[in-house]
Design a protein with these regions (language model features):
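Terminal helix-to-tail segments of small alpha-helical proteins
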Residues: 1-149
């Protein structure tokens, strides 16, 4: 990841939840975002197939009320730091049995942003005084997300 991109992610986590992250956190973060997008896309694919379609549309994505609110929060933060182009490159488009519509692909960066805001807030839920997430914090938060998404 470029130095400028690293600085934007660091700023994002400070704005979203007053967290200080480092390079090792950013590797875990990238893996996390891609894993969760893949999980959402698997459910979207099942919805599209169940409805007899061969393309995944935005309404197939299982976006909960909470995630939608985090996407809105991401948009407000993104106005300050312009992270969306970096998330567009970061958010993997894993090959599935069905294709994605252009509208679905266009939503990937904002979904990644919403997941990112939820991640940042989750650290504060497990430890309100946390400033610098450690491995144990990452493991706890990842287990929680695996239970829910």
């Amino acid at each position: 990841m470029e130095v400028m991109a690293i600085a934007k992610f660091e700023r994002f986590f400070r704005l979203a939840a007053s967290l200080d992250v480092d390079k090792s956190d950013l590797k875990r973060y990238g893996d996390f975002v891609n894993d969760k997008i893949y999980d959402l896309l698997l459910r979207a694919q099942a919805a599209a197939k169940a409805n007899g379609r061969d393309v995944i549309e935005p309404h197939d994505l299982p976006i909960t009320k909470g995630l939608q609110e985090r996407i809105h929060e991401f948009r407000r933060i993104d106005e300050q730091i312009e992270l969306q182009p970096i998330l567009d490159q970061l958010a993997a488009r894993p090959p599935l049995d069905l294709a994605y519509s252009e509208e679905t692909e266009a939503r990937f960066p904002e979904i990644a942003g919403g997941i990112s805001v939820a991640l940042a807030h989750s650290f504060k839920v497990i430890d309100p005084d946390l400033k610098n997430p450690q491995t144990k914090h990452w493991e706890c938060v990842l287990r929680i997300f695996d239970l829910l998404l």
